[in-house]
Amino acid sequence: MTDMHSLLVAAILGIVEGLTEFLPVSSTGHMIIVGHLLGFEGDTAKTFEVVIQLGSILAVVVMFWRRLFGLIGIHFGHPPHEGVGKGRLSLIHILLGMVPAVVLGLVFHDFIKSLFNPINVMYALVVGGVLLIIAEVLKPKEPKAPGLDDMTYRQAFFIGCFQCLALWPGFSRSGATISGGMLVGVSRYAASEFSFLLAVPMMMGATALDLYKSMGFLTMADLPMFAVGFVTAFVVALVAIKTFLHIIKRISFIPFAIYRFIVAAAVFAVFM
């Protein structure tokens, strides 16, 4: 690749990562398609994806830094988003939401890695879309937990169980956790916020492990490309999260489910 070409590829993939990482549409599915179309595949591409995921994670930290500090008992006034004030969401909620996926992820790590292929991703996109529709249809008319601080430990644990579905590549971690939250009585907005908060420790742990294993593929020559991808993913993820939290107050997740089916069809068209 030429230098300019590699930077353009980095920017495009950073945009894709930032837009899709925290939406219930599967960033994995999008990265597979776009990476294939751009001819950017292989070990360097996998390492690049790990690095730009860190940019997306940083966006969540910036967006929810007050709430994250609050989880460890450090408060800076009231966080500027809904469902805040009672201070009932705790680190225990986050830990309960993490445990199921962490345990299964460690036990079945090698098997999960073997599932990373376009066909499995395609099926996961479809099943995840169906789950979003089921969640919208079966969710309680009046949520038991309208805000984050209304969530119970039991609800947090069940959301964590649903997060295990995201170990299937292409399912979408946010899609699984948000759907699970709605089905156990958490409002669409609060379930989305909890999904974002849960992403920080989950993704940081997984990304740190992948980055450690990929160190051999990092070179100084790739640094500009990785930096462009990281910064692009961070900025785009900030905008995507803000926009997403704004629009879900007004629309259901049905459009996201339909979009997942379209992406699944695209994966089928490109790789079958």
Swiss-Prot record:
EC number(s) from the headed UniProt entry: 3.6.1.27
Claim: Membrane is one of the keywords in the record: yes
Tagged with keyword Phosphoprotein: no
Lineage: superkingdom: Bacteria
Entry keywords, A to Z: Antibiotic resistance, Cell inner membrane, Cell membrane, Cell shape, Cell wall biogenesis/degradation, Hydrolase, Membrane, Peptidoglycan synthesis, Transmembrane, Transmembrane helix
Topological relation to the membrane, as annotated: Multi-pass membrane protein
Membrane spanning stretches: 6-26, 45-65, 89-109, 115-135, 156-176, 189-209, 221-241, 251-271
GO biological process: cell wall organization; peptidoglycan biosynthetic process; regulation of cell shape; response to antibiotic
A single GO molecular function term of this UniProt record: undecaprenyl-diphosphatase activity
Coiled-coil positions: none
GO annotations of cellular component type: plasma membrane
Catalytic reactions of this protein: di-trans,octa-cis-undecaprenyl diphosphate + H2O = di-trans,octa-cis-undecaprenyl phosphate + phosphate + H(+)
Main location: membrane
Localization per Swiss-Prot or TrEMBL: Cell inner membrane
Similarity annotation: Belongs to the UppP family.
Job description of the protein: Catalyzes the dephosphorylation of undecaprenyl diphosphate (UPP). Confers resistance to bacitracin.
Comment field (misc): Bacitracin is thought to be involved in the inhibition of peptidoglycan synthesis by sequestering undecaprenyl diphosphate, thereby reducing the pool of lipid carrier available.
Protein name: Undecaprenyl-diphosphatase
The encoding gene: uppP
